Regions:
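Alpha-helix-loop-beta-strand connector modules within alpha/beta enzyme cores
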Residues: 1, 88-116
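Non-globular sequence segments
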Residues: 1-65, 69
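An active-site metal/cofactor-coordinating segment within enzyme catalytic domains
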Residues: 14, 85, 97
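Non-cysteine beta-strand/loop elements that form the S-adenosyl-L-methionine
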Residues: 76-77, 85-89
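Conserved active-site and cofactor/substrate-binding residues in soluble primary-metabolism enzymes
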Residues: 47-50, 54-57, 82, 105-112
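A structural motif corresponding to the C-terminal end of an alpha-helix
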Residues: 65-72, 112-116
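Hydrophobic faces of well-ordered beta-strands that scaffold small-molecule active sites
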Residues: 1-2, 74-76
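Glycine-rich beta-alpha junction loops
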Residues: 4-7, 78-82
Length: 116
């Protein structure tokens, strides 16, 4: 946390608001559905339904850590092939459960993240 605070303090010198761009990347690539990632030649493992609440909570924990470090805002990145984007896009979300299919269903994971 001290190193993050030092980064945040550098932003304090100017008049710009401090924010952190949040992305969660793990060692094992996971996605909305199993298959090759459209943005790289990586094969991703589709997240199981029971894993989704913990993943959404991880976003929430990251936001709390950023707040503790003194950031004013957090960007939830939901584009360009990142995890939330994979749930939103019919090209990467081939799920057959309540997280796939209609736009409302594909938005369900993003809604979980925002609630955290």
């Amino acid at each position: 946390m001290p190193s993050i605070r030092r980064v945040r303090q550098r932003y304090s010198v100017g008049t710009l608001r401090k924010h952190v761009s949040q992305s969660i990347c793990g060692v094992t690539p996971v996605g909305a559905s199993s298959g090759f990632n459209l943005y790289s030649p990586t094969f991703v493992r589709g997240l199981r339904k029971d894993e989704l609440p913990a993943m959404a909570k991880a976003y929430g924990r990251s936001v709390n850590l950023a707040r503790e470090a003194g950031f004013d805002a957090v960007e939830i990145h939901a584009g360009h092939g990142y995890l939330i984007s994979q749930f939103l896009s019919p090209y990467t979300n081939h799920r057959k459960d309540e997280y796939g299919g209609s736009l409302e269903n594909r938005m369900r994971f993003m809604d979980m993240v925002m609630e955290e």
